[in-house]
Amino acid sequence: CCAIGVNVPTGKDSLSLTQQYPNGDKIISPGTVIVTSGGEVSDVRQVVSPVLVNDKNTRLYHIDFSFDEQRLGGSAFAQSLGKIGSDVPTVKEPQYFCDCFDAVQEMIRRGWILAGHDISAGGLITTLLEMTFANAEGGLHINLHDIKGDDVIKKLFAENPGVVIQVADEHKEEVKEFLTENCIGFARIGTPSPDKRTLSIADGDWKAEFDIDAMRETWYKTSYLLDRKQSMNGMAKKRAQNYKKQPIEMKFNADFTGTLQQYGLDADRWKTSTPNTHHQTPKAAIIREKGTNGEREMAYALYLAGFEVKDVMMTDLITGRETLEEVNMIVFCGGFSNSDVLGSAKGWAGAFLYNPKAKQALDRFYAREDTLSLGICNGCQLMVELNLINPEHKHRAHLCHNTSKKFESSFLNLTIPQNNSVMFSSLSGNKLGIWVAHGEGRFYLPEAEDKYNVIAKYNYAEYPGNPNGSDYNVAGICSADGRHLAMMPHLERAIFPWQQAYYPRERRQDEVTPWIEAFVNARKWVESKL
């Protein structure tokens, strides 16, 4: 750690744990050392994806950080043979390791690296396969000739620290010159094969070809076996059947530029503006309960869109310190109010229903015709529990436990259908990526689908694309007049491209995603009512 300049902030003795049983038995924990490291990210927008870019006009290079021979001791390969091994790889030259790391960082900064993946458990062959798994098509043609050593097994399975990087042909000479000048060893190892779904590997006279989809099935099997112990109602099997059949699809409005300027927004607004108490400024209040945890992302999304944002705790409403009379929009954020002890949002709803001042403030707010409201995740559950979306329905909607009976957290696809929502109507026809994180997100909708103002649907009817089993694949609904919206996914956590698990590569320079438009629409509507 001293040699490479890494501080050790703390330590935990995990090698002496024992478990005592009433009958006197004592189990000593196996010797285990876990080392976790973290590093500064100076620009979250300048990151490299581990997913291979399917472009034949690119090259893959292997950079070994270890300056050591390939060794199989302690590797996943050795363990798969029931062995451990004593000949393990190490970092022989700490300064060389630092030089390699710094060189890769500089190439990322210069925009030369299209994709990259570390070499760790499973070795080089696992790295190459994992770079292809997330793609629906395409493969790799690999030649190990330039990697030092005579043992192809060691080349493929040794876990010496290193990386594989993908470089466009237009930058390959710059990359080679840069690495050579900095005395960094590298080996060209292959190119993508966009038309063939295989990993082809050659090393001299030795050749092998692997079916990527078959390898992915093997790679995924352990996850399936664990999932089977956690998920109910056969959802683990559903996930195993569907995880390769539900690709993320993106479709934006034709006039979407991805710039803040398109919406008249300024990311540096906070540097130049001061709080404005003028009555003509749109004001939004974020209402929180004990356990709410999504208020900061929501506050920033609203503020960026032009709102002045107010933080309101339930105690403010219960005591009468806050009446919502000067607020144009209220937002109920995600989280786990009251730790979900009474069920999702049940306790939060009770705080409104059984505290006269809080109930009066809410009733008066919803009685006005110049207001908007938004509920996300736990806030969506609250709005449905309080029957704020469709009070005219004879049969009430409910949010129930996910069909899998477990907490679901994933990045998936939504389609925005035609709707009259203030926030979402302009996004009709879009297909967008978004995060979900909930345990009780299944919409039970007892009325016919056309009785609901549906503002968002999961792209796929089957699990896991529909993560909770919601009726009609519904992810969000709105009041009949379009003013009050409740949805389970977190649009406030997806307003920037760097927040999304996947965003179209050709749009990587976008400043914002289409989700920001929903907040801008809300602000414009409020302004029209002032």
Which residues are covered by each model-predicted region?
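N-terminal beta1-alpha1 cap of cysteine-dependent amidohydrolase-like domains
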Residues: 203-376, 380-391, 401-408, 471, ...
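Short, acidic Gly/Pro/Ser/Thr-rich loop/turn segments
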Residues: 42-43, 67-70, 172, 291-294, ...
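Short hydrophobic/aromatic beta-strand micro-patches
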Residues: 164-168
